[in-house]
Amino acid sequence: MSDLKQDQARERKAVFKTISGQPVERLYTAESLGGDHAAEHPGFPGEFPFTRGIYPTMYRSRLWTMRQYAGFATAAESNKRYRYLLSKGQKGLSVAFDLPTQIGMDSDHALAAGEVGKVGVAIDSIEDMETLFAGIPLDTVSTSMTINATAAILLCLYVAVAKRQGASLGKLAGTVQNDVLKEYIARGTYIYPVGPAMRIVTDIFAWCRDALPRWNTISISGYHIREAGSTAVQEVAFTLADGIAYVQAALDAGLAVDDFAPQLSFFFNAHNDLLEEIAKFRAARRLWARIMKERFAAKDERSLMLRFHAQTAGSSLTAQQPENNIVRVGMQALAAVLGGCQSLHTNSLDEALALPTEDAALIALRTQQIIAQETGVANTIDPVAGSYAIESITSQIEAGARAYLNKIDALGGMRQAIESGYVQTEIQKSAFDYQRAVETREQMVVGVNDFQAEEERKIPTLSIDPALEREQVARLKALRSKRDSGKTAATLAELERRSRTSENLLPAILMAIENYATVGEISDTLRAVFGEYQESVVL
């Protein structure tokens, strides 16, 4: 071989891998598909197993929903941000709640001090919820609420406000995250032990089936699993394992699979590795369709469809050279779109530093609008299909996820896998491996371990006025002083009674809310009966 050819054949690395550590071939050909029928014949969009998308015409009929996640400080402050985003072309709302709201504590709880309105909006009562959606008719928008341990309470608050607006409950559209299992393995905002928490999940399924037919009763979330450090394969596997557990719990509670499965939805991370991420979404869709058909004998085609929201990867954003995050977010969003998402949130450039400013949030929204209107990727359906690389990686991820699912089944299911610490340990190992790769410069991160700036330029960031917490606490105190305490206490007593039976909890929660019971009071009523989850130490 000539010196020129030898130089041309020399590669940059000895081994090429995806960001998750999966090997990447030098060249993908038809032989890379290895006779895999699904890879060689990916089928058509809108047809089982939905590798190419869940709808026949995908974005040629309707673009994905641009649903920017927002919420901070008080309900009034967040309402201003929602109305601003809607005025700029956003089509759906996505609500971020503060930590006290997420774990069932009122804003005046001692442990809430310093956290009120910090990472999301503070919601204590129906009055706060009414302010949050003031001037926004709830039967004209779809709303996603990222809430889990207190999902039943926040859903009932939303319904109570809709009733006050005179909206038809049959027209309410949206999603409540309601995915408690991932809290035990990745995020930590749990309250109750696993058993009672799963009971609340299935109560929501059953109640919404009749009361809110257009509502998505759960968003089974891989996003936080990936943010905790998992690989793409683990994100698919552990998310679908959670999904299997929820379906089985609903069946055990007496629900028929096709009565609730069409309202299941999913939430995935859109990370940096473009090809791996596109393939990940396709693999998840195909695998879920097969699980629902083969394992649960679902007959309704909608029960087989993995509908998903995506959010760009917060953990990939860097505090160093934060303007670079605009590019990261743009590429991640492109992966989600090419992977066939139904809705998308694009992170803001400043989120490694603080909650997003209004200007940063607008750039994030404009990123989606540019992808939709200027790149042409939405003009044809599943343009990546047939790529040897994409189809091969799709099958590789599906096979890896199946292996994890088999292991979880052997452990007795996802609940047992969580309680034994298996899932947490697997995620921790992957997180360690990734961080080590960054620190040894095997994994390059621009601005962090390569192409660093000698002096970092500061950008404007959002700060929350501490006075807003005092104002929130004062409003809560005023609510308690003016409500009919006897009626409130009576509704909480009814909730306690129901919680000791198998009766559905949501009618009692709604009644308590309409009588001005607070998020903390309702949560404490259930704590008194169910107890609190004690985390296992996983080494």
What is each PLM-predicted segment?
Residues 87, 91, 134-138, 160-168, ...:
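Generic secondary-structure signature for well-ordered alpha-helical cores
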Residues 256-260, 298-312, 320-349, 356-381, ...:
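Flexible glycine/proline-rich, aromatic-decorated loop/lid segments
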Residues 124, 147-150, 162-164, 187-208, ...:
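Phosphate/diphosphate-binding loops
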Residues 2-271, 276, 295, 302-309, ...:
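Catalytic alpha/beta active-site cores
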Residues 62, 108-111, 181-184, 219-222, ...:
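Short acidic (Asp/Glu) and glycine-rich catalytic loops that position anionic groups and cofactors
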Residues 114-118, 143, 182-192, 225-230, ...:
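Short beta-alpha connecting loops at secondary-structure transitions
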